[in-house]
């Protein structure tokens, strides 16, 4: 989940899964030369958390962390010098069959789907079949966006949709169980039965600021279909996936029978298998891509080479530069988010579908990158693997952990903090069990916390610093959540 999204959402991308632990490296994984195998071992043994605690162990082994986080299947691809240096699968695709993960194993990519979608939409712009800065209703045929007074007379453009600056509702999608009646795109956009989400509507005028909207991405999917007169998955295969060599990947929902033997099974936070093994996402552009790290690495490499004018399998250098240029927001570009570390820019995206989470990063200039995917709702390990790759391959200042020292607090002081807090529909409880302190989310997920001062605490599992705020009488009233420059506030519930 990108930091621009509400911070409380992060809990549901990194909650701990429970159940069986994973086995080691899957069969049919390629072997490499000694130098590369040595690098792989270094990556496997150098996982690091977002925060370093003074006087404690700060690096871990991949297998240990998979067991600790109860991760069943994990797959990695590492890019170096504009090439896939290595790719490897770990664990099992399904806890019943115990089938090992390979580099071919397919995962749902969640919102990473948006990156390839933007590529497909920009291909239409490049071919002069649409204009990025024209009212979307110019291209919509099977449905029209219902403008109202909220948009203040301003028109939404495709550029707004791709950069999450359209001022639209509907952050994401839960998908549908296999066997459910699947809604059409117009039904989804209008929130009509059998759609399981609210209508996609204006919440503020377009072009004003960033607000993440999978609903807006779904409008872009319908535009692709209405302009090309092709099913979305067919257009994306012929114009994006196939040209990139992403031969294992597909936007087809549900996946074809030919792909079934490659599909990893999805698992929920409580360790239970997602009913039907995975959800179906008719919102293909926003969440419907099935892929693996090796295929996504091909997309990253093509983006890097196109940016340098060395390849144009899908987009020209000019169009690739446009795709990677933030639009209105300081970091949200077209289907990607841009960040900078040590003077190097990176493009990337996170993904989360039911029972799957993933992340990728690609550098602008150095030819480095990484993709990590797991078949669990637990995303805590993604950052740790990425940090390890960045450290082993010398990505300057990419991994700069927060350093904290644990302090002890009295029971009397803790009692002033204990209780329930409320934020955007979610309840957060501060409690103690034995000698340990916990943050409990909606009475379901429990995170061990440590105090770094008398008013500040953290969890190694959540990249957020929490701070208690008191009123004039010295009574605790709020908890501030801070992630980077983003802040949210959870208010203490009355009678606590």
Model segments located where?
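Bacterial Sec-dependent N-terminal signal peptides
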Residues: 1-31
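Catalytic loop of the DD-peptidase/beta-lactamase superfamily, centered on the K-T-G motif
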Residues: 22-88, 225-238, 277-496
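Short linear capping/connector segments at secondary-structure termini
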Residues: 43, 47, 92, 135-144, ...
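Short active-site loop at a secondary-structure junction
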Residues: 46, 65-77, 96-160, 202-215, ...
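A generic alpha-helix surface/boundary motif
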Residues: 60, 118-119, 134, 218, ...
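Short, solvent-exposed turn/loop segments enriched in Gly/Ser/Thr/Pro and often Arg
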Residues: 77-80, 136, 140, 251-259
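Short, surface-exposed loop or secondary-structure junction motifs
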Residues: 90, 94, 148-355, 359
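A short, polar/charged loop-to-alpha-helix boundary motif
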Residues: 93-103, 381-387
């Amino acid at each position: 989940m990108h930091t621009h999204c509400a911070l409380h959402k992060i809990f549901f991308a990194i909650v701990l899964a429970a159940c069986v632990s994973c086995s080691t490296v899957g069969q049919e994984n390629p072997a490499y030369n000694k130098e590369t195998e040595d690098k792989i071992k270094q990556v496997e043994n150098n996982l690091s958390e977002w925060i370093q605690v003074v006087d404690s162990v700060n690096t871990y082994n991949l297998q240990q962390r998979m067991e600790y986080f109860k991760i069943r299947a994990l797959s990695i691809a590492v890019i170096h010098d504009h090439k896939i240096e290595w790719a490897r699968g770990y664990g099992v695709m399904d806890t019943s069959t115990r089938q090992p993960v390979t580099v071919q194993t397919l995962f749902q990519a969640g919102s990473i789907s948006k990156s390839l979608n933007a590529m497909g939409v920009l291909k239409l712009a490049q071919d002069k079949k649409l204009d990025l800065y024209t009212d979307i209703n110019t291209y919509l045929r099977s449905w029209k966006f219902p403008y109202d007074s909220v948009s203040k007379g301003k028109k939404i453009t495709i550029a707004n949709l791709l950069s999450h600056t359209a001022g639209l509702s509907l952050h994401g999608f839960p998908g549908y169980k296999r066997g459910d009646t699947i809604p059409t795109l117009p039904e989804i956009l209008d929130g009509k039965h059998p759609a399981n989400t609210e209508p996609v509507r204006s919440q503020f005028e377009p072009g004003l600021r960033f607000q993440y909207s999978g609903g807006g991405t779904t409008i872009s999917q319908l535009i692709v279909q209405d302009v090309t007169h092709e099913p979305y998955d067919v257009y994306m295969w012929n114009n994006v996936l196939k040209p990139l060599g992403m031969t294992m990947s597909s936007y087809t929902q549900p996946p074809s029978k030919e792909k079934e033997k490659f599909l990893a099974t999805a698992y929920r936070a409580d360790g239970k298998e997602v009913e039907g093994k995975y959800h179906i996402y008719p919102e293909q552009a926003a969440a419907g891509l099935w892929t693996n790290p090796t295929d996504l690495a091909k997309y990253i490499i093509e983006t890097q080479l196109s940016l340098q004018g060395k390849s144009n399998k899908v987009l020209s250098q000019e169009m690739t530069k446009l795709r990677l240029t933030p639009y209105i927001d300081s970091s949200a570009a077209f289907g990607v988010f841009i960040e900078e570390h040590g003077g190097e820019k990176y493009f990337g995206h996170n993904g989360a579908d039911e029972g799957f989470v993933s992340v990728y990063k690609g550098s602008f200039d150095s030819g480095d990158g990484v993709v990590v995917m797991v078949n669990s709702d637990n995303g805590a390990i993604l950052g740790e693997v990425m940090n390890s790759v960045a450290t082993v391959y010398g990505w300057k200042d990419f991994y700069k952990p927060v350093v904290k020292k644990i302090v002890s607090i009295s029971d009397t002081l803790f009692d002033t903090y204990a209780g329930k807090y409320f934020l955007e529909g979610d309840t957060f409880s501060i409690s103690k069990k034995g000698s340990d302190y916990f943050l409990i989310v909606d009475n379901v997920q429990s995170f061990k916390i440590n105090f770094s001062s008398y008013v500040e605490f953290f969890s190694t599992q959540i990249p957020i610093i929490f701070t208690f705020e008191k009123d004039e009488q010295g009574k605790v009233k709020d908890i501030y959540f801070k992630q980077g420059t983003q802040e949210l506030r959870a208010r203490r519930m009355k009678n606590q």
